[in-house]
């Protein structure tokens, strides 16, 4: 199961991982926390969506449905239902303080919604952002908190038993990037890429998804409101490099499975599970 903040985040950050496991026949589920109502609309033929958060949210809900069809058989949940939690906007914007935004949502409401999904899906592995949100986006941070705060209650039989049988998630990973990756893409002439990274030795798992790079790109192309892969900017250049389908994770809950290489990286998120 993967927990993401907005439509397109799942394809950008974990698209190859999702495609790999869907192709292998694993049950893959996605939780999307908001509809991305405040995203920047990049396609001029969709200019009517600019400044219209409700219309953009509805449009992006359609885009994610197309993207998931490209990635494979993915079970999709909107946290609390479609539109329940709203986009907070980029860090530092006035919208971060809106009462209805995800970053300001009542923790009990968010926890209840996440526990209900965890107990229904009963995942063996859950993936989300690190506690910085990857690059500090308020909704990414809130998505991390939504999952991490729900893990204990989901496993507690005394917590809202009407939400289903308790479930204790065996392994939780946070998405990340190793410092060596950033050096590699800079050496290849791709500039402007300054995410939060970690030392290579702190990485737990590396999934080489280059065999699924085409699916990841196909999913991203469905997000016409948000992404252009043909304008030659740094993001378009980056994602079309097959190395963009190598996805990196840090284990934060559960036992590390067998790995390989100088850093003993797992190559399977289910490593060590029966």
Curated annotation (Swiss-Prot):
S-S bonds: none
Class of enzymatic activity (EC top level): hydrolase
Function of the molecule: Catalyzes the deacetylation of 1D-myo-inositol 2-acetamido-2-deoxy-alpha-D-glucopyranoside (GlcNAc-Ins) in the mycothiol biosynthesis pathway.
Pfam families (alphabetical): PIG-L
An individual GO BP term: mycothiol biosynthetic process
Co-factor(s): Zn(2+)
Annotated Zn(2+) binding sites: 6, 9, 140
Protein origin, superkingdom: Bacteria
Protein name in UniProt: 1D-myo-inositol 2-acetamido-2-deoxy-alpha-D-glucopyranoside deacetylase 2
Keywords tagged on the record: Hydrolase, Metal-binding, Zinc
EC number of the protein: 3.5.1.103
Cofactor note: Binds 1 zinc ion per subunit.
Family to which the UniProt record says this protein belongs: Belongs to the MshB deacetylase family.
GO MF assignments: N-acetylglucosaminylinositol deacetylase activity; zinc ion binding
HAMAP family xrefs: MshB
High-level lineage: Bacteria, Bacillati, Actinomycetota, Actinomycetes, Pseudonocardiales
Reactions listed under catalytic activity: 1D-myo-inositol 2-acetamido-2-deoxy-alpha-D-glucopyranoside + H2O = 1D-myo-inositol 2-amino-2-deoxy-alpha-D-glucopyranoside + acetate
InterPro entries membership: GlcNAc_PI_deacetylase-related, LmbE-like_dom_sf, Mycothiol_biosynthesis_MshB
